[in-house]
Amino acid sequence: MTNTKNQPKSNGLGATVIEYPDGTKRQQTTPDPKAAPVKLDFKLDLLKHIPDCTFKRYVLDVAKMTQIPANTSLMVALGIVSSVTTRCYVVTYDDSTQYQPASLYVICEQDIGTGKSWMLSTYQSPVFATEKTLVDAYLARQKAAEAAKQEFDEPYPNFSYDTDVTPEGLDETLARTRGYFCLASAEQGLANSITGAGYKSDGKTNKDLWLKGFNGEYHSSKRSKRGGYRGKVVGTVTSIAQYGVVDTILDNSDGTGAVERCWLISDPSNLSERMYGREHRHFPGEGHQGAYNRIISDLTAKAAECQSIEQLPGYRIAAADWDKIYALQNELKQHLRDGGKYSTAILKGITVKADIQIMKVAVNLAIMDDCPQGLIPSQWIDAAIGMFRDYLESVYYLLIDKGLIGTNALEDSVIAFLGDKTKTHTRSAFQQAKSKVKPWSELPKGGKGQVITDTFDGLEAKGIIWKNQDTGVYQLIA
């Protein structure tokens, strides 16, 4: 992949839908009918889809208290909520025979010194408090049984968060937790560990747990020096770390589908706008805090029982609401054709998981609104659909901003050159003609030739240009 980190950006970044004419390496495609011009000022607002409720007000309270954007607050909250709901309930498909766990993978990034740990610990607080109460009571009963010389075979109230663990290390804990794992951290190390980014360059990255834990799939491992696990695995991931954690996930997915399972939230930093002083302090409303603590405490007590996922009761979705999900899938599928707006591997992978993400978000929203087990009210399906639609759009712009799709100023210069029929379209001809004019003149002289090579190679990899191997002449695929 071309390194575009320090390349200047142009204004019209990469919204063009590419058509491949006959005679090239790719088949001709129909332009994506709804591909809109790129708007780099797209602002994600997930909260607008959620109707007024105590949970929404609490999320906004925590966002205001920590002065971290509300999208991040919402998704960190849902990540922690899912860490306990995952061990309590599932959500069933329309045939009622298959199900999805309530688990979510949430990856958020924020600036240094913005209170990321504060936000995470705020949402985890009732989990920790309940866990301590359960463990204290367990130890008291155990001590009483020993004093009375009675047998004591109660299962330990098993619930905890891992903050930095390798897949191999996590594998050892699965038998004890009946296949559940729960990861949460405000540090980059978690993302490095689960993606293998912290491994040596020649090390093998094991993403099996990461991939299978999302859907509650079967996992079997045999370790030469460690205990293995065989059975279904279900996991949750909540990470709010410094800027760069999203890049870590994107760079280390390796086409496995790992990144497509995540909610990637990269809210802008408001560090320069933060207000300090007692008059600017804000704390959650007592009623909002109390409702959140009560629901999470009850869920944590139930989650600590560690029932196998096959034994968990389920929420379900009404037929009319399934029709809404199917309608969204039919709407989005037209963007998946070659050259379509969401036709790149990452966006395609996210799009085809629309139903799964909607199911997972909706059941967690319903549970946090005190909805009893059974039918999920339509308002939470509508909210999850709206959230997913906007999230997908935000990832589209995020990938453009990070140079993974679309074009930058250097690439635009090459495209313009290849579009000039009076020029000989070789790499050396381009270097002679353009290396001393902007944007190329802004680059240091040393290594400029390599940047030109990388830019041509990157455009070829994106399917925007191709090279005649016999003549060395480049041609636009458009």
Description of each model-found segment:
Residues 2, 9-478:
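Phosphate-handling catalytic cores of nucleic-acid transaction enzymes
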